[in-house]
């Protein structure tokens, strides 16, 4: 019975862990050695000082390769690290303002939004209302529409201006190149 406290590790099928009656073996150079028993393949791998690694379990018969497992594992980890470096998750950056914003402040917000969009992030443009300002929601909509037209070359509107509580917001996403 397996120990429930210790998580079962998914050990790679190499050398003695390969439990099939017959396997197709590929040499370290890529040449096929044919269909042989795992014991014969292990002897060949031991002679060369290499490991027998299960490559494809689903094939009939399963495919194994003679290689240096430590080097193979290192290469796989290196590829995974490189892939992780290259992927960029699109964050949602927020640009907040009031509907009575001055021109210079508005330009600062536009430049912020452009910088976020160039970095590949989505932008949430929010207009906050205080007190009775909520009566002027049409002015906030005009402001967000103006922002959308000013950013038309850099962004697509993901969600049109919409009022939510004491805020009006719009989502912009970077244009696909």
Swiss-Prot record:
* Keyword terms of this UniProt record: Cytoplasm, Initiation factor, Protein biosynthesis
Query: Which function does this protein serve?
Result: IF-3 binds to the 30S ribosomal subunit and shifts the equilibrium between 70S ribosomes and their 50S and 30S subunits in favor of the free subunits, thus enhancing the availability of 30S subunits on which protein synthesis initiation begins.
Q: Where is it localised?
A: Cytoplasm
Q: Show the Pfam families listed in the entry.
A: IF3_C, IF3_N
Record NCBIfam families: infC
Listed name of the protein: Translation initiation factor IF-3
On the tree of life, the source organism's domain of life is: Bacteria
Q: Does the keyword Disulfide bond apply?
A: no
Name the principal localization, coarsely classed.
Answer: cytoplasm
GO MF annotation: an example? translation initiation factor activity
What does the subunit comment say? Monomer.
User: So what family is this one in?
Assistant: Belongs to the IF-3 family.
Which SUPFAM superfamilies did the record assign? Translation initiation factor IF3, C-terminal domain (SSF55200), Translation initiation factor IF3, N-terminal domain (SSF54364)
| GO CC list | cytosol
A biological process (GO) annotation for this entry? Answer: ribosome disassembly
Gene name linked to the record: infC
